[in-house]
Amino acid sequence: ESTEDEKAMQQMVERLFPEYASQFSFEQSEKIDKDWYEIEAQGGIVRIRGNNANSMAVGLNYYLNHYCLTSVSWYVNDTVEMPEVLPMPPAKITSTARCKNRFFLNYCTFGYTMPWWTWKDWERLIDWMALNGINMPLAITGQESVWYRVWTKLGLTDEEIRNYFTGPAHLPWHRMSNLDYWQGPLPKEWLDTQEALQKQIVARERQFNMRPILPAFAGHVPSELKRIYPEAKISRMSSWGGFEDKYRSHFLDPLDPLFATIQKEFLEEQTKLFGTDHIYGADPFNEVAPP
């Protein structure tokens, strides 16, 4: 019976070029200290072995690039141009990874076209990431749903929370504490759909042996928190990008006991929704001066 990694690879080729799927075979083999793959032609079948799905995907990409002279883009509507007859490698090809951790994406990427992506767009990007050996992707979609739960638990109202968030296109800069409120309030329906999307994203990334890097609390808080915690050491950040002062964000002193409380609440709520691989990203002072 096929392993989960072998199934993941077979499903990938069925998504990318279904008419050729039966001509590929994937075999998960014993692990060594490094990620590795092996490509070999056997009886008209391209056999790709590796220690996991991620490694086998890199092997598949090598075969596509060097033998089919084609490439897979991360845009779902781009077809993969394949030769009429699959070329068979004349000799066995083997390769091992040069580095263990292979990171991809940044905070701003999630504010260009990604706010409007559907699962089909993400599915293709994750295939592309696997083909290119990415195993530590930044995964920050849907975090507002986590924050909504945390801020509600701490006493903020629905209106206060959703007004504090920016509109979808500016959320990456809101997350990096550049601005608040701009083009809000964020609809509750949007929070819910992004939460569902993130569940699909991290599940598929883990299927390809990736460890999604989830967000952690970096000190950025709603100004309304001062209403509930008047003694908290909350400072105002510098202005950013020419926006009016009313959009400036607020920062909680990491030495304030409330900081650890919020961090714990956030990580616990996030883990309930999305699981964890125990790797987190935080970007507290992007293009703003620390208080």
Language-model features: where?
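Bacterial Sec-dependent signal peptides at the C-terminal "C-region" and cleavage site
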Residues: E1-T3
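Auxiliary, metal-adjacent structural segments of Zn-dependent hydrolase domains
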Residues: V13-I32, E84
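Aromatic-residue-lined binding/catalytic grooves and analogous aromatic/hydrophobic interfacial grooves
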Residues: H66-Y67
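Glycine/proline-rich low-complexity spacer/linker segments in large multi-domain proteins
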Residues: S71-V76
